[in-house]
């Protein structure tokens, strides 16, 4: 029935700021919803249409299945008809789990594991030669090398790391006459087995034979080995139960030796028990590196974090884990050490010799030190080696159980590649299996572009048998690689952690996965898929969205990108303004129709009636002062030198993955911050030299991370406006008469807040088969404060009423109070006039959070010596909002500061004073400076992808 309907018909949508709107969305079309930031686009696309589609799907499942799924609340809409099953592909980062990678998300790594398990060839780490299976005769010869009189068990591993009760398997063994098993390391009689938990993994081995080695065994050993190998599909364990007394042997009691009819190196004895997909999984105990447990990283106590500021003396607290005011015991220990090695604890740490520093950090080895400890009238003298700061911290970390102390100790650790697996995450057994001379870790470390090229030539390197086995696997892998290439992610590697991806990258990965699934009849809802994408790659992304449509799906995209709007089959413009000024359908139709709607701000920009103007001249900066970063080599950077003129608006451009963030965030920002704030826990990328920091007093990274993680954080508290509002309420006559202090008007502490909801205004009710429900607190009616506090009013408004005001309303309300008004006007200047000043931080988008931070910086007293770094500040912004944002950023520069933006948006780039274009491509083919200069210089450079697209914006 749904398939025959022409439209998804939404009637009476009132979610958030939507004003009872009716809209028809054509099915099986590429539809763009546009409009100002905060106008209600996401409220319509995600909170109404997607939420209802998802809710209907989940409701159709059994109550058992529903308890594992999040059930959406019914959106505030009268009716939606013609709705298909809905899939949302939003901006949220895929996963913070370090085990989640690009390879696991896209399932390419799963196919790689299968490929290596089926056609990979194991090589001996000792000889470098291919290794082969063992025969029973070879196994007998190895066993006969054990000392005579050794007692052994021959074990057949029936179950290895699988869940279940295994009643049938145990019954079969009983019928075959076996009497003893080893279950999870414990020897058990087969008639007296413990009950196995079907939800836990188990190891079960059959004791096939118990043998004492001597010459009279005859064929018993070979027969028992064959029985064991048959039982366990070619694998058997030998366990040494007891060695004869007074016999020296290289073998040990309880040692296990694995025999396999499959793979073994006769020279080194290196063995592979199996070549199955699970040994290539870093999430399985059968494949994960035992040292790092499949993470690929180790965490070490770092000298630079233990003593972050070497300008401080030991006596004054240079050794941070031992406290800024070290205890008497520690000071006496360090004084004794100083007396022994003839150094002072009162001089800056930096002036100590390297030998003294090594002893302090690592200990005195076997050299004993005379320590004197005074306790009142008693003096205790001990002569022993000094353990060292790092070994002491390691011991504490190993033995302490307190989570809080462990978290505190973690502050002094830095991460490094695992020394056992070199960051590949896998056991040696997995890394010795190769295809075309590469192991699976090396293949996962290639960029998508390099991987596609490697697979295109792989067929030439496989024999006929391997090719026959691998044909279908290769097809699945190459298809998925092609989809990733098409969405502009050719620079990523399969081993890249999901948590390090930007919102745009993770969204495009999920988009590529959806195309790979080949579903049809689905409603896809996407949130700005063009974010983080260079103009060059935008065309490929749009073609991908159209391909999704051509599979028979409805593609609904919330988007501001002009090219995407032009390519859409149908456009819905929500507005006209943001917040309470939005929530209406202003215009509908194709791009030419949208241009003609006078009320549509989008239409004005599309038609050229309104534009972002190119500045008539560019700034040259402060007397040729500049920050110079030399020899940057972090990630893919190729020994890069850059010069950033101070007092300018500088844009860093380049295709996705070219090295912009590596250069600006991971190297420049972190290096400058480390210099200005030595105690900060940041690890800059490698570079040779950083000059010009004497010209700045602050460096600020205004990013899109949340301004708070609880409902109590809000724009008013973050910007400091709420502090002044509370101060104002305390000074009111009624407050003074009652003796109220500032804490009375805080919802974070006892006194004035409602204790029933602890100042949240909501009470969480846990449901079993349904999602948790938040209901308005019936004591304070959602106002957060108790009745006495709410009785204090200014101009007829309580403090709770003020928190419910929009920024615009609050500005009018407090226009005569400069301290509050100045904080609020900056929020309005960055285009956030529509948000409520008490709006929960958890409900703000990344772009809104970034602009709240920007507003906070604007409200500070400027020194004119600040360097601001913003990574894609146009994320989530309509072109009209970008126009407002540019005025704010240029205002910061006019105050003498330097603004550095990493940006793809050409309307922003064209207004820059100076541009640094990184590239020319992404990944290994990037990391170089293509061109630097004014927008005109960039546009004139033929090698610059940015310049090619910028040219038409400068006309």
UniProtKB/Swiss-Prot annotation:
Record SUPFAM superfamilies: P-loop containing nucleoside triphosphate hydrolases
Q: Look up the record and report any one GO term of the cellular component aspect.
A: cytoplasm
Q: Where are the zinc fingers (C4-type)?
A: 754-780
- ABC transporter domain span: 322-601, 621-951
User: Where is the protein found, in the record's own terms?
Assistant: Cytoplasm
Q: Which GO terms describe its molecular function?
A: ATP binding; ATP hydrolysis activity; DNA binding; excinuclease ABC activity; zinc ion binding
Main localization is: cytoplasm
The UniProt function text for this chain reads: The UvrABC repair system catalyzes the recognition and processing of DNA lesions. UvrA is an ATPase and a DNA-binding protein. A damage recognition complex composed of 2 UvrA and 2 UvrB subunits scans DNA for abnormalities. When the presence of a lesion has been verified by UvrB, the UvrA molecules dissociate.
How would you summarize the oligomeric state and partners of this protein?
Forms a heterotetramer with UvrB during the search for lesions.
| The protein's name in its UniProt record | UvrABC system protein A
Source organism of this protein record: Rickettsia conorii (strain ATCC VR-613 / Malish 7)
